[in-house]
Amino acid sequence: MKKQLLAALIGGFLLAPMAASAADYVIDREGAHASITFKVSHLGYSYVVGRFNDFSGDFSYDAKNPTAAKVNVKVNTLSVDSNHAERDKHIRSGDFLNTAKFAEATFVSTSVEDKGNGDMVITGNFTLNGVTKPLAIQAHAVGEGQDPWGGYRAGFTGTTTFAMKDYGIKMDLGPASANVELDLVVEGVRK
């Protein structure tokens, strides 16, 4: 009886799937499966919408343990694109992004809170215009699985809002235009 129980335990251990661990992914910007867009109120009447065309990053993620996730993103602020060349020149100036001095923005996660059903709050250090402050991103796991090319992918969306003045942007466009909304779409390819 003891031998049968021992054999069953050993067999069960050997046949049981190993505990899942976080997988590492690279953000698929080159395949145009990721985007960083922004929206700022234009004097309270409408919105200026734009994007950053050049960014890179990676993340670790395990759906069974989202709190262990890690995210690192670098954004080339020179790549700002609001579909208006003169406005983009102004956004790159010292009035806003000061890209001559700070050509890169970064986000490095410090914690992830699992809200259930794929929802998370990813908190990290966001550096923009030479200023680093904590920033929380409301994120959602869209899905994951095999792709047709033999790889494995995981996708997420995220949103966050920050005040321009918190990052040393002193241009005052009025209270309706004080905040920037970021919308993130991220698809990663497992390394």
Swiss-Prot record:
The keyword Protein biosynthesis does not apply. Keywords: Periplasm, Signal. Residues 1-22 form the signal peptide. It is found in: Periplasm. GO terms for cellular component: periplasmic space. Belongs to the UPF0312 family. Type 1 subfamily. This is UPF0312 protein Shewmr7_1249. It comes from Shewanella sp. (strain MR-7). The lineage of its organism: Bacteria, Pseudomonadati, Pseudomonadota, Gammaproteobacteria, Alteromonadales.
